[in-house]
């Protein structure tokens, strides 16, 4: 049985949650942090994933990749790439399929990985983290992604999960997952015919800003409107601060950090810390030791100066709010509460701008960092066949109208708008077409002029085959089940031909008919399912052979990572054993080894230490094991003698203690008997005592 796993796939950090019988828990990683850096790095032998990638980022700057979700499913020639490339320190390249990849040094070679592979590496890492921490089997996941993700990017996220060995039961909009978290755990929501509670959610994370208007009743949620700014996030504030100090340091210290990626990254990391400090203080010092050219750079920044630096960004705060309200058909006065989530909403000036946009105070009843992950875990639990959860219905919203188009064979029309903009999903529509043979269908966004710039209007294509025309007919009716699934992906779920058959049915008798009346039978024509047709989908998902190849590559790299980790553990165990045994030979083991044994073992330890730092500094796991066992063959004999003597001492001490306890018990019993005897004497009558004397 798989434990439901929810992943809030953040741009800077990701949060992991699992659903269990007692509730939903956040999973801590190997260093007990409640979030994990969304980052992968590459070394001479193995990969560095999550925390280890972050730790080595400064020293491994060109081989460390962050901002993973921003390049997933993105074309190299897309205008967004120019904005994204500013935040990467590794080399980004154009792949054969036109997508973005990164070129790094891995295992001593120049290697290129696709964005899907990079995301799969990280997802595999967090899967292992959840399995280790929960000691549970993890196969199903609900991944929370940005609302602005296209169909192609959602397929890419699902493919990355499959490469990592997971079944993506749902790709959910991150802000919708936060809404689910709100709706599930709120106990005071309206019921029945009561007016729904209207809540605006503001999520400003590391790289983007989303506003969503939702309506809540007990056990249900409906998204009314959503808008976003893809390039408004914490990293933009960090970059503004970094650029400010880049100019200052160029004048003050005659250094240009823009020409040194490592220096620029160090300043940007310090800028992020400064931003957080200024959330609680009006001014703060800023310093970076040995930033470049042996220069220790220092300065300071006030909150007022920061607000001036990001003033152009703050002017964009109201736009997503206005658009989301317009899509919902509401005004700011209709909003009951404004919930803020995401780390960047902690910036005071940003909070003030949001509050002013709605004209009301902000609410922070949700955990700003963990609400999305918990909502995703609950959604995953809904799909679990073994875990019971409280009933909760939620519907998201189509941002753009989607039409289906087909070959024009019999009908006058060759397209139909199936899923209008602002309609809810998941949803299913049935349509019937008259076909003269096999045919193809396409799904496209209806109005190209409504789409964001450079968004491809094509969504998917399907080939429908197996259409058989009855003898004497020129066409056959075909019914198609069109669906926008819970992940927002457009599919044709089923296709089958129809036929008319004549059946006999009894005509119901009137109520006043005699008891012996015989019902009349008439023939009626019914349309029934005839042949199930074959559907071949052409979507953005990876082909099976390509997917299997990438799964195999990921498994190989995972095995290599595991081998390197195990080898390092064996090396550390050997080093620790050498130092520990050497110290104990002159202390607690001294009386349990002959002079010859001590001399021999000390010589072996010295040679083993020399080997460890020379020929054995970088070798295979088996050699560390062999060297350890060679030393342990003698060391364990001496240790055995020591432990035997210690056990003998314990036995003697135990026997002595038992004897002392027995003696104490005997003394106590004797004292008790004496006391009882004295008490008996005191109780004897005086007359009886005299009579006994006579």
Swiss-Prot record:
UniProt keyword annotation of Repressor present: no
GO cellular component terms given for this protein: cytosol; fungal biofilm matrix; nucleus
GO molecular function: adenyl-nucleotide exchange factor activity; ATP binding; ATP-dependent protein folding chaperone; peptide binding
InterPro entries: ATPase_NBD, Heat_shock_70_CS, HSP70_C_sf, HSP70_peptide-bd_sf, Hsp_70_fam
Positions of the UniProt region annotated as Disordered: 671-694
Keywords, in A-Z order: ATP-binding, Chaperone, Cytoplasm, Nucleotide-binding, Stress response
Domain of life: Eukaryota
Family to which the UniProt record says this protein belongs: Belongs to the heat shock protein 70 family.
PANTHER family xrefs: HSC70CB, ISOFORM G, HSC70CB, ISOFORM G-RELATED
Protein's name according to its UniProt entry: Heat shock protein homolog SSE1
Species, as recorded: Candida glabrata (strain ATCC 2001 / BCRC 20586 / JCM 3761 / NBRC 0622 / NRRL Y-65 / CBS 138) (Yeast)
């Amino acid at each position: 049985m798989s434990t439901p796993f929810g992943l809030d796939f953040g741009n800077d950090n990701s949060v992991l949650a699992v659903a269990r019988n007692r509730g939903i828990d956040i999973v801590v990683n190997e260093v007990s942090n409640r979030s994990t850096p969304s980052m992968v790095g590459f070394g001479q032998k193995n990969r560095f994933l999550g925390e280890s990638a972050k730790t080595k980022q400064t020293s491994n700057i060109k081989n460390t990749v962050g901002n993973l979700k921003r390049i997933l499913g993105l074309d190299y020639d897309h205008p967004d790439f120019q904005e994204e490339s500013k935040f990467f320190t590794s080399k980004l390249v154009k792949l054969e399929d036109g997508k973005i990849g990164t070129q790094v040094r891995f295992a001593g070679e120049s290697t290129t990985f696709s964005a899907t592979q990079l995301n799969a590496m990280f997802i595999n890492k967090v899967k292992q983290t959840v399995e280790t921490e929960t000691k549970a089997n993890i196969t199903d996941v609900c991944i929370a992604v940005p609302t602005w993700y296209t169909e192609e990017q959602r397929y890419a996220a699902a493919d990355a999960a499959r490469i990592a060995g997971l079944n993506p039961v749902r790709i959910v909009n991150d802000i919708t997952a936060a809404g689910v978290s709100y709706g599930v755990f709120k106990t005071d929501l309206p019921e029945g015919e009561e007016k729904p509670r209207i809540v605006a959610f503001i999520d400003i994370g590391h790289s983007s800003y989303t506003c969503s208007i939702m309506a809540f009743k007990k056990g249900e949620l409906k998204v009314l409107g959503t808008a976003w700014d893809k390039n408004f996030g914490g990293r933009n504030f960090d970059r503004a601060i970094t650029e400010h100090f880049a100019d200052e340091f160029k004048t003050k210290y005659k250094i240009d950090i823009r020409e040194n990626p490592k220096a620029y990254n160090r300043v940007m990391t310090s800028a992020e810390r400064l931003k957080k400090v200024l959330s609680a203080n009006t001014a703060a010092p800023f310093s970076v030791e040995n930033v470049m050219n042996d220069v220790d750079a220092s300065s300071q920044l006030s909150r007022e100066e920061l607000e001036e630096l990001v003033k152009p960004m703050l002017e964009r705060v109201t736009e997503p709010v206005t658009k989301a309200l317009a899509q919902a058909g509401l005004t700011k006065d209709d909003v009951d509460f404004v919930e803020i989530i995401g780390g960047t909403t902690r910036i005071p000036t940003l909070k003030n701008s949001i509050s002013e946009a709605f004209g009301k105070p902000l609410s922070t009843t949700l955990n700003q960092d963990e609400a999305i992950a918990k909502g995703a875990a609950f959604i995953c639990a809904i799909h679990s066949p073994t875990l019971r959860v409280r009933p909760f219905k939620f519907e998201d919203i189509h941002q753009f109208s989607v039409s289906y188009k087909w070959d024009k064979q019999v009908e006058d029309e060759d397209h139909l708008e199936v899923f209008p903009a602002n309609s809810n999903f998941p949803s299913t529509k049935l349509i019937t077409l008259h076909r003269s043979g096999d045919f193809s269908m396409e799904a496209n966004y209806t109005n190209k002029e409504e789409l964001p710039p450079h968004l491809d209007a094509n969504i998917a294509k399907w080939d429908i085959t197996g259409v058989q025309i009855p003898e004497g007919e020129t066409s056959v009716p075909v019914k198609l089940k069109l669906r926008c699934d819970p992940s927002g992906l457009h599919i044709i779920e089923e296709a089958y031909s129809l036929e008319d058959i004549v059946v006999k049915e009894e005509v119901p008798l009137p109520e006043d008919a005699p008891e012996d009346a015989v019902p009349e039978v008439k023939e009626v024509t019914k349309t029934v399912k005839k042949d199930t047709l074959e559907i071949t989908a052409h979507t953005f998902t990876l082909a099976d052979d390509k997917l299997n190849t990438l799964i195999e590559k990921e498994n190989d790299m995972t095995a290599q990572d595991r081998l390197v980790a195990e080898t390092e553990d064996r090396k550390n165990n050997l080093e620790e054993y050498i130092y520990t045994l050497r110290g104990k030979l002159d202390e607690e083991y001294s009386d349990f080894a002959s002079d010859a044994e001590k001399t021999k073992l000390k010589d072996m330890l010295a040679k083993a230490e020399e080997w460890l730092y020379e020929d054995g500094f970088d070798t295979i796991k088996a050699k560390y094991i062999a060297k350890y066992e060679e030393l342990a063959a003698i060391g364990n004999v001496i240790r055995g003698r020591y432990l035997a003597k210690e056990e003998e001492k314990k036995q003697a001490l135990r026997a002595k203690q038992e004897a002392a306890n027995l003696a104490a018990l005997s003394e106590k019993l004797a004292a008790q008997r004496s006391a009882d005897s004295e008490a008996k004497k005191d109780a004897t009558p005086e007359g009886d005592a005299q009579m006994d004397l006579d």
